[in-house]
Regions:
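Acidic/glycine-enriched connector segments
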Residues: 5-7, 27, 34, 49-124, ...
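Generic N-terminal amphipathic, Lys/Arg-enriched alpha-helix
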Residues: 7-23, 33-39
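Residues at the starts of beta-strands that form the adenosine-phosphate
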Residues: 12, 42, 65, 127
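Glycine-/small-residue-rich active-site loops that bind phosphorylated ligands and cofactors
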Residues: 20-21, 43, 113
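Short active-site oxyanion
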Residues: 40-43, 145-146
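Short acidic-hydrophobic, aromatic-tinged amphipathic segments that line or gate anion-handling sites
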Residues: 85-89, 145-154
Length: 154
């Protein structure tokens, strides 16, 4: 049986990326959060610092909803502008919950953790948009199915 979302149900976007973002990268993530909130998306992220904190700040500026899935059981370590927090107490394993929660995943900057989240997203069939992050090419040199590169948040 296939689940069907009710008409008008919110769409979810998972935003992943650098936990230590440069000011430029944080500005892009904040702008992305603003744009997603303006369009009515619920934003899911890892709930901590860097890109996660910046995207939540952008969402809050525009009155949107953000959900942070934390790696630990301590809600006090969450980014301050999140609407809701989920304490997973799962460490890096929470990355699967972050990417599985979105209808699409947007990667902004990042290092090895972000690369692992991109792989997890594709393994569960989520489309991925790459914004100032890893350049990924399959062994045959072609395009990766379900992965697109973007130059700006717009």
């Amino acid at each position: 049986m296939t689940a069907v979302e009710p008409a008008g149900a919110p769409r979810y976007v998972s935003v992943i990326g650098a936990s230590r973002a440069t000011p430029e990268l944080a500005a892009k993530a904040e702008e992305l959060g603003e744009l997603l909130a303006e369009r009515g998306f619920v934003v899911v992220c890892g709930g901590r610092s860097g890109v996660m904190e910046a995207v939540a700040r952008g969402v809050k500026k525009k009155g949107g909803v953000s959900i942070g899935i934390l790696p630990e059981a301590d809600r006090l370590r969450a980014a301050p502008d999140l609407t809701y927090t989920v304490c997973s107490a799962m460490g890096y394993a929470r990355n699967l919950s972050v990417v599985a929660s979105g209808d699409v995943v947007i990667a902004v900057g990042g290092a090895w953790g972000t690369l692992s989240e991109i792989a997890l997203a594709r393994n569960v069939g989520k489309p991925v948009i790459l914004l100032d992050t890893w350049s990924i090419t399959p062994p045959d040199g072609g395009e990766l199915d379900g992965v697109r590169r973007a130059g700006t948040p717009v």
